[in-house]
Amino acid sequence: MMGVVLGEGKLPFWIQKEVELKSSVKKGARGMAARRVQEWLQFHGFGLVIDEDFGGVTKKMVQQFQEARGLGTSGMVNAATFQELVAPLLQVLTPISAANHTFSTMVLEYAKAHLAQHPLEVGGQNRGPWVRVYMKGHDGAEFPWCAGFVTFILKQAAETLGMTMPIQGSTSCDSLAAQGKEAGLFMKESTLNGENASIDHLSRASIFFVRRSSTDWTHTGLATAFHRDAFETIEGNTNDEGSREGYEVCSRSRGYNKKDFILL
């Protein structure tokens, strides 16, 4: 397997489950092994119902995927087929050179790497392999994953540079904001207002929060570039409409209204 960043060369157990095939999966298989195959088939555009039952339809989709990738069309998911299915995830786990990078620029490079693979939910709200990777093995409606995505990127950047993260990280927006305050890195929207306000000291990459109240934030992501009236983002669990319950990692432009930041 290609090199990875997290876990000092060894993948955390919840990621191992997503990218390591213990035995071939074929027609008749049930449960998570079948589900993962179905999820990745759907991710790659081979649509089918995700029901954790490897039946005739799943076998047919596997054969179509194998044919498209120049593999033998057995309809059985062996190691070679599985590696092709999970290739986008393996790609984002591949270390990026740390040369000439600060922490904030390293964060930006990893965020771009994830964006290029277009992670998205598969099989329902907050479901699928990408969500489980960002959320330490959890998925489902009760696991919004925007903060998990941010934390995962920060961990990759910190481990690549051999440094401690500026904040601990969390799967909760409110916890991330609290950590930023405790570290003295939190910047309120109010500091951007007024005649003497400036955005020039914002880092190339920072964490942004969508604020509902002074103690409640509903969404978070990475701010990647700043302009006078708007900033650019890479964020998870959102969509082109900017919903806090979206379905993908995407890049957006946002205004500063009701936004706070953690400086990186």
Predicted regions and their residues:
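N-terminal capping segments
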Residues: 3-8, 12-20, 82-165
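Residue-level detector of conserved, well-ordered beta-strand and adjacent loop positions
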Residues: 8-13, 26, 86, 112, ...
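Short acidic, glycine/serine/threonine-rich helix-capping segments at coil-helix boundaries
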Residues: 24-88
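Solvent-exposed, acidic/flexible segments
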Residues: 27-34, 51, 55, 59, ...
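...with weaker cross-activation on analogous glycine-rich loops/strands in unrelated enzymes
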Residues: 57, 101, 105, 160-243
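Terminal peptide-recognition signature
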Residues: 62, 146, 150, 205
